[in-house]
Each structure stands twice: as C-alpha cells, then as structure tokens.
Amino acid sequence: MVKSHIGSWILVLFVAMWSDVGLCKKRPKPGGGWNTGGSRYPGPGSPGGNRYPPQGGGGWGQPHGGGWGQPHGGGWGQPHGGGWGQPHGGGWGQPHGGGGWGQGGTHGQWNKPSKPKTNMKHVAGAAAAGAVVGGLGGYMLGSAMSRPLIHFGSDYEDRYYRENMHRYPNQVYYRPVDQYSNQNNFVHDCVNITVKEHTVTTTTKGENFTETDIKMMERVVEQMCITQYQRESQAYYQRGASVILFSSPPVILLISFLIFLIVG
C-alpha cells in the first residue's frame, strides 16, 4: 500500500515537472515582446525605452512632462520627445530616433531589401534532371556518357567509327519525360536536337562532317538518348512515389506529432 502511494506521488511529481518545463519554454522572455522593456516603442511603465526617453512628469501641458504638445515630453510633435515626426525622438521616420523605420539609429536595418528565397523544389529538380540550356527552348543537357560500341555491318565502318568516335557527342539534349507520350517520341526529338546542335557547334570551329559521320553519329546518339530516357523515367517515377508517400494522411499525422514533441 505504501509503495503504491509512493509511486503515485512520484508520477504526479514527474507530470508537474514536465508541465512546468513546457510552460517555461512557452513563457515569453522579458524585454523581447511588444511594448516591453526591449521594445522600440515602449509604454509608459516599461523598464526600458527609446534612446531619447521623456525627461519630466506625465501631465498634459507640463513643461517637462510626457503629454501631447509639451516642449520636452514624449508626445506627438514634440521637439525632443519620442513621438511621430519628432526631430530627436524615436518614432517613425525620425532622423535621430532609436528604433523606427528609416531612422538614423537603425543603420539601415529596415531599409535593406529582403533576399530572394531559393525555391528548393526547383533546385532539386535541376539537380536531378540536368542543367537547362539557354537558347534551346527548355532543353536540358544530360550528364556525360561513355560512347557505346556499335557494329555497323562492315569492317570499314567499324574501323572508321573506332577512329572517329571521339568527334561525336557524349552528352545529349532532351526535355523532361513528362512532355512526351512514349519513348519513341522522346528519342526522336533527343536525336534531332543533339545531332543538329553538335554539328552546328563543330562546324563553326572549322571541322566538317561527312555523310558517314552523320550516319554513325545518329546511331550513337540514339543509343545515348535511350539510356537518358530510362534514367529520367526512373527518376520521375521515384519523385512521384515520394510525393505520394509524404502526402498520405498517416505520414502527415506522424510528422505533425514529431514536430509537436520537438517544439512543445
């Protein structure tokens, strides 16, 4: 009987301590809230204050008070007070104030433009899909690949390919797979844009391609485009599965519960 009472008191004490810790976490810190000691616009009874606090009493019309229209008070329009538009106060737009917007004492804190936020979805998509190529209408450049070993049906063509394969592209241009209805359309578009871009770029450097080069280049690029399609399709379905997983109600409830435990 005594042991059960002791266990009950220990449980009550533990719950009380846990509640007190939770309240301490949620209790506002002194000096950091609105109209507290650390506020830029403190109230009449606040321990802290502006850089130029009122110097006198608190009656209206007194020479050193804090009422409206006093010469040395803290009311609106006073020459040495802390109200709005005062030359030495701490209100909005004052040249020597201590905490308002655009004041000299803030050192441009409120005037600095906010930094643009990076969209993490776009960053992740660009990293997974490849870099978007400017001037090619939304095409992306895939990662470098090893040129495949292809047999063209004759010893001459096989030897010619082995001797000239370094002149052919090892990267392909493509668009996201969700813009195509099937693999054939993706590969066809990928081959055309890659061969065209590589041919134009190489020709401007003073190197020309023969009909044999174009034939072999199309075969090589076709194999590379098929590989690129398989990679992109797999990555696309994996991203879709991840979105479905994290959008399911049980997962959302679990994540919300974990966040509640961490924050609370």
UniProtKB/Swiss-Prot annotation:
Annotated spans, 6 X 8 AA tandem repeats of P-H-G-G-G-W-G-Q:
54-103
Renumbered to this chain, the signal peptide range is 1-24
Its annotated compartments are:
Cell membrane; Golgi apparatus
List positions binding Cu(2+) 2: 80-82
Provide the propeptide boundaries. 242-264
Please report any disulfide bonds recorded for this protein chain, giving both cysteine positions: 190-225
- Feature: compositional bias, Gly residues: 55-107
Question: Region Disordered: start and end of each range?
Answer: 28-118
Query: Which UniProt keywords are present, listed alphabetically?
Result: Amyloid, Cell membrane, Copper, Disulfide bond, Glycoprotein, Golgi apparatus, GPI-anchor, Lipoprotein, Membrane, Metal-binding, Prion, Repeat, Signal, Zinc
Q: Which residue intervals make up region (Interaction with GRB2, ERI3 and SYN1)?
A: 25-241
Q: What is its main location?
A: membrane
* Any one Gene Ontology BP term: protein homooligomerization
Q: Which domain of life is it from?
A: Eukaryota
Against Pfam families, the record matches this protein to: Prion, Prion_bPrPp, Prion_octapep
Q: Does the keyword Membrane apply?
A: yes
sequence repeat residue intervals:
54-62, 63-70, 71-78, 79-86, 87-94, 95-103
Positions binding Cu(2+) 3 in this chain are: 88-90
Lipid attachment in record (GPI-anchor amidated alanine): 241
Q: Which family does it belong to?
A: Belongs to the prion family.
Write out the function statement from the record. Answer: Its primary physiological function is unclear. Has cytoprotective activity against internal or environmental stresses. May play a role in neuronal development and synaptic plasticity. May be required for neuronal myelin sheath maintenance. May play a role in iron uptake and iron homeostasis. Soluble oligomers are toxic to cultured neuroblastoma cells and induce apoptosis (in vitro). Association with GPC1 (via its heparan sulfate chains) targets PRNP to lipid rafts. Also provides Cu(2+) or Zn(2+) for the ascorbate-mediated GPC1 deaminase degradation of its heparan sulfate side chains.
Q: How is this protein organized at the quaternary level?
A: Monomer and homodimer. Has a tendency to aggregate into amyloid fibrils containing a cross-beta spine, formed by a steric zipper of superposed beta-strands. Soluble oligomers may represent an intermediate stage on the path to fibril formation. Copper binding may promote oligomerization. Interacts with GRB2, APP, ERI3/PRNPIP and SYN1. Mislocalized cytosolically exposed PrP interacts with MGRN1; this interaction alters MGRN1 subcellular location and causes lysosomal enlargement. Interacts with KIAA1191.
Q: What's the protein called, per UniProt?
A: Major prion protein
